[in-house]
Design a protein with these regions (language model features):
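Sequence-level detector for tyrosine residue identity
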Residues: 5, 50-52, 77
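Mg2+/Mn2+-dependent nuclease catalytic core
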Residues: 12-31
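Helix-rich interaction surfaces within compact, conserved domain-sized segments
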Residues: 55-91
Length: 91
């Protein structure tokens, strides 16, 4: 649909920590500040999918899964809802 966005993919197998490196945090925040649509998509230990805004990368790195996601979906996954979340502003 002509909308560019970037997604950092992560998997958490146990615990609450989302393994974002400092370079990834910096890139996501900087890109977001310059108008880029950036997201962090995480599969949780219980197979849910959490979506965070890239601008929140520092909080995601610090708080991990304790931070409330902008979107949480369970199986069976609603892929259309996820797609819409990438192309619209998620607050």
């Amino acid at each position: 649909d002509g909308v560019e966005y970037w997604v950092e993919l992560k998997v958490v197998n146990s615990g609450k920590k989302i393994g974002l490196r400092p370079e990834q945090v910096g890139w996501l925040i900087k890109r977001s500040l310059h108008g880029g649509r950036c997201f962090i998509l995480v599969r949780t230990p219980d197979a849910q999918i959490y979506l965070y805004n890239g601008a929140d990368a520092r909080e995601v790195a610090d708080e991990g899964l304790r931070l409330e996601p902008k979107l949480a979906i369970k199986k069976p996954y609603d892929w259309e809802l996820l797609k819409k979340s990438f192309t619209t502003v998620v607050k």
